Structures are given as C-alpha cells and as structure tokens.
C-alpha cells in the first residue's frame, strides 16, 4: 500500500471546480481525498490513521494541477511517413490526385505491411511515450494500416502489450480495419466489408475496446458502416464513426441510430446534423490540427451551444498530423474553434473520458484514477498562451512518470 500527499497546489483544476491552496491524497492508484489544504483531515479511514504517517509528501510549489489529459482520436500504429505528400498537398494537389499517384492511406498500408514487427513496435512505443511525457495519460489508439485480419489483430495485441510496459499511457484500442479498402479487395468492397464484420469478434477477443469505420467519400458508405459497426457492437465493442470529413453522407444519422460513442471529424455539418447529435446524445470528437490542414473547421461553438458533448483529439496520423501534445491541441482548439480555455480543457479531460466510456478518469475526485499533471504554470490560461504548455510532473495511477 502506498499513500502519497500532493500539497501546496496553487490552483487545482479538478474538472468539477477550481480550488486554490489545494491538496490531493492518493491511495495506491486512486484519489482518496481532494480539497483545500486547510481542510485536509487528520485521518482518512482505510487509507491513513494519521496524516503525518503518509509514505510520500510532495510540495508542488504553488503550481497548476489538472487531471491527466485524454487524447480521444489517434492513428499511431504505422511505419514510414508522408512528408513529401504533405508538401505536395500544400502546393495545391488534391487528395484524389495524390491517391491516384500512389499516395494517401494506401501508401502507408504498403510501408506498414513491409515493416518488421520489432521496428513497428519501437515506433509505436516512442509515440505513446511522447503522449505520456507531455501530460496525456490516456490515448485512444486505432489500428487501420495493415487491413488484413492477421495484421489488424496483431496491431490490437501490440497496443495492449505496450500499455503494460512502464511509463506508458493507458490505451483505449479501436479496431479500424474499415479505414480504406485494401488493394487486394479493389472491385470487391462488399466482400471486404463482410470480412471486417466477421473479424470484429476476433478483435474483441484480442483486446479491442471499440470499432470504427471511416464513413465518407472514397471510403465506406453508410450501409457498409452500419454492417461493420453493428457487427462490432454485437460482440461488445463500442461503435464510433469517422463522419463528415469530406462530405455529408448520413454518418451523423447513422451514429444516432446505432448509439455511437462518438462521431469524429465533422468538418462538413448541417444544422440538422447538430440537432440530431444534440437530440440523441452523440458526442463529437474534433481535431483542430487536421481541420486546419484540410481547411474546413467543424462548427464547435454551435455544437456547444446546442449541448453536444465535445472531446478533443490530436488525430495523430502519418498523413496530416504528428502531434502528441494535447496541451498544444487545447491551444489550437481555443484559437481555431473559438473555445474557451475551460471548455477546451474539459474537452481534453472529461470529454475524452466520456467518449471512451471511462468514468474513472478525466476528473480529480475521490475514487477516480490518480492520473494527475503538475504544469509549468500557475493558471489554466497558460494553455492558450504557450501553444504547448509543458508539464513539470506527471503521475499515472499515483506513480510518478520518470
């Protein structure tokens, strides 16, 4: 049993309230008590008989403390890069012309398939560690660059094994075999969709938490997405959907119909789409870096106005975005989407916990996981000012990250 007291917290942003001169008592991997330091009890039943007997006391020097950040949308299992493609894209080439020339997701699939497991694992490990060291304690991580049964299942297992290593964030694994149609299935898209639906049970057995489909122009139709998502839901996977990145194809309506845990992207939305998400309680995952790259911003302020739950994701992927810092994503969300700092920080904590079905994190409160970050600042406004606020210390489940 380990009891740790974090004290002299100048500003504690819990997710529920903001406290000054605060303290947190941690018992093993959970928060036992949180509040203003003058209110710290002398004893906590089942935790410590006398507060002077705690194992570790850490003075945080008046700093800002928040819950560990949560990245609700990433694609970290890949090899190679597409730097040259991005340079061409920014020069005016269309996505269609790049794909026709052998670029796009398909090029990453080719490289990833040709990469040995050891090299692939090391690349994913480095990315995941980058998230944790920048203050992100939970990462949603998608497969989707092998697009074979064995390759996709190996990616699920890889993520699960890496999560067990020291100094790694918690990982929510999403099965995204329905990313694009692989070349060996060109002209047989329906056959591939049916195969992916059949693989969902194997993905769940391998440790996947969610199933996702890229439902958009050039990817999968709503009917195809329905088949895969329903197949995943039937074996216990949370359904989520890439929606409205290139066009409106009914993905939002499908998300409402199936009770999806989130609709992600949402660069192209109508007032009707927003009303549907609000009415049926479909959360939105938005990614400012990718939205800026694509030149289409989701109507985040309008969604907030209508009561849609917002979560933030980096959308880390080999084609558009290499970000592993959610503090940078928060700053970009404030600047690009017009979110308040408080709304953006909630979207990067409680919002992420909501869409990942993880009520044990995202808020600093008794009984929650002790995923805690001390920042190099004394106020949350520093997130918007710094564009990449650095943590001083990170605790994952009450254990300091080295």
Q: What function would you assign to each model-found segment?
A:
Residues 41-43, 379-385:
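Short, Lys/Arg- and Gly-enriched loop/turn segments at beta-strand edges
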Residues 391-402:
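Short peripheral tails and domain-boundary helices/loops at the edges of structured domains
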Residues 9-10, 24, 29, 62, ...:
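Divalent metal-coordination and catalytic microenvironments
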Residues 237-239, 247-363, 375-379, 401-402:
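Active-site-adjacent C-terminal substructures of enzyme catalytic domains
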């Amino acid at each position: 049993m380990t009891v740790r007291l974090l004290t002299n917290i100048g500003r504690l942003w819990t997710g529920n309230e903001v406290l000054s001169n605060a303290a947190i008592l941690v018992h093993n991997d959970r928060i036992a008590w949180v509040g203003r330091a003058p209110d710290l009890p002398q004893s906590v039943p089942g935790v410590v008989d006398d507060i002077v007997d705690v194992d570790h006391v850490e003075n945080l020097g008046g700093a800002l403390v928040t819950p560990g950040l949560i990245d609700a949308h990433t694609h970290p299992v890949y090899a190679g890069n597409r730097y040259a493609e991005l340079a061409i894209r920014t020069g005016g080439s269309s996505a269609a012309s790049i794909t026709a020339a052998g670029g796009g997701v398909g090029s990453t699939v080719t490289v990833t398939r040709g990469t040995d497991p050891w090299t692939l694992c090391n690349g994913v490990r480095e990315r995941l560690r980058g998230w944790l060291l920048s203050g992100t304690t939970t990462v949603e991580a998608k497969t989707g660059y092998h697009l074979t049964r064995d390759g996709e299942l190996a990616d699920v297992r890889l993520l699960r094994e890496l999560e067990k290593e020291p100094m790694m964030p918690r990982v929510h694994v999403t099965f995204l075999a329905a990313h694009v149609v692989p070349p060996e299935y060109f002209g047989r898209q329906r056959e591939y969709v049916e195969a992916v639906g059949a693989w969902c049970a194997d993905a769940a057995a391998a440790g996947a938490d969610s199933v996702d489909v890229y439902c958009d122009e050039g990817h999968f139709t709503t009917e195809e997405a329905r088949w895969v998502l329903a197949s995943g839901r039937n074996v216990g996977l949370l359904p989520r959907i890439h929606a409205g990145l290139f066009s409106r194809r009914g993905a939002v309506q499908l998300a409402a119909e199936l009770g999806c845990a989130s609709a992600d992207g949402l660069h192209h939305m109508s007032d009707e789409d927003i009303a549907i998400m609000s009415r049926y309680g479909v959360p939105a995952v938005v990614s400012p870096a990718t939205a800026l790259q694509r030149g289409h911003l989701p109507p985040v302020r309008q969604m907030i106005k209508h009561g849609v739950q917002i979560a933030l994701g980096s959308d880390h992927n080999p084609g558009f975005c290499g970000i592993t810092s959610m503090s940078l994503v928060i700053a970009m969300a404030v600047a690009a989407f017009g979110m308040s700092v408080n709304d953006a920080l909630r979207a990067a904590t409680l919002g992420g916990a909501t869409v990942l079905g993880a009520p044990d994190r995202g808020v600093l409160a008794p009984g929650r996981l002790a995923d805690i970050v001390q920042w190099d600042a004394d106020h949350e406004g520093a997130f918007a000012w710094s564009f990449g606020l650095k943590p001083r210390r990170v605790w994952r489940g009450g254990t300091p990250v080295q």
